[in-house]
Amino acid sequence: MITEYKEVLGNSKFVYLWMSQLFSQLTINVTNFLFLLKLFSLTGSTIATSLLWISYALPVILVGPLAAATVDMFDRRSMLMLTNFLQALSIFLYALLKNPSIFLVYGLAMTYSFLNQFYVPAEAASLPSVVPKKNLPQANSIFFLTQQGSLAIGFAIAGLLNHFLGFSTSLFIGAGFLFLAFVSVSFLPRLKPLEELPKNFEEGLGDFFSRLVEGYRLIKSNRMVLSPLILLLGLQVCLAVIAVNVPKIVQDVLGLSANVGMAFIAFSAGLGAGTGAILLSKLIKVGWRKKRMIDNFLLSLGIFMLLFIFTSGGFLGPLNIFVSFLTIFFMGLSFIGVIIPAQTFLQEKIPGGFRGRVFGNYWFLATIITIFPVLFAGTIAELFGIKLMFMLIGAIVVLVSFFSRRWGQNYLEEGAFNGL
């Protein structure tokens, strides 16, 4: 196994593409949380931070399908270079401004997201061109781990960068990372399109929607696919809702400064997630079924979310931070304990020819689904407080766990192959 990864990492073309992904992912996650901190410091409003998510989401919905269809129309190296350069330029120019309007933050988020709709599919389409087919599983694993790791690292260091270097300097660093991504992909060979422009565009756009429809039909007709997918989408909604409200959680629940609090949450949850991944492998070895893991960790997640709120009043005195660390740690552990078995179960139950149709459009569907919950949660937190919002999410998670334990197995068995 180690030899296989060494072979991939010894491929210079892959390394150039991977470095571009690493710098790009770090930048988008760091700037995301920098913008959250900036908006919250200026407005103190969870609605304002929720609108940042909407600014990122709109280009995904409006441009995503079109951008995905254009990937094979142009030289993919040129597309990667162009998007990286324009993203770096947009962040650099914004960082030069003195006291810009908060509306420009939303404009920059939309611009970055718009360009990202072209970068991400071009990156994914380039991977098979620079890596031999036999090494694709290892290459995809490295890309997935980089994506998840960049999210955790970006969340952790955004507050520290903002605290020690300031907002503008942190953005200059982000622009520098994107320029390094631009330089890295410039070393790739030209990846020219194979067919003419109009034909590729029509086929690409048609293929995107046909795959979406085919995936929808499979999902609707097979509860073994529908159930874990709904669970994963629900967890994605919860994660998005919590992420945009992190500054409010840090201020009102933990009583810490936003910069320090974000690093505290990232460290606690990240440590829990890492521990959870190790624990899962041990549970699998002793014979735990995926359904059992999902039910138990889902209940654990809901309970620790409620404990996080009920133990945050400050009445624990010096122990308050330690108890908060423990509850966040176990939330991270429980979250991974649900995500990994649910995703594995879904991968096993989707017929091989349909996996691309379901997973290829997962983030597109997740973005659409999260828009209204994010806005609704921001409004709830604004009007009634962040603790009520967190309590509602925790209660819903506990209820879902209860229904899954009570009726989940029968539901799956009765409709496993309905319509197939």
Question: Each predicted region: which residue ranges?
Answer:
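Flexible cytoplasmic inter-helical loops of multi-pass small-molecule transporters
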Residues: 187-214, 415-420
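Membrane-helix boundary and inter-helical linker elements of multi-pass secondary transporters
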Residues: 10, 41-42, 72-73, 98, ...
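C-terminal transmembrane bundle of multi-pass solute transporters/carriers
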Residues: 52, 62-66, 73, 77-79, ...
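Short loop-to-helix capping motifs
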Residues: 11-12, 45, 101, 166, ...
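Helix-loop boundary and gating motifs at the non-cytosolic
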Residues: 2-58, 217, 221-269
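Hydrophobic alpha-helical transmembrane segments
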Residues: 102-107, 113, 138-198, 267, ...
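Structural signal for membrane-spanning alpha-helices in multi-pass inner-membrane proteins
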Residues: 36, 91-98, 158, 162, ...
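Substrate-agnostic recognition of the 12-TM MFS/MFS-like secondary transporter fold
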Residues: 15-32, 55-69, 75-88, 104-163, ...
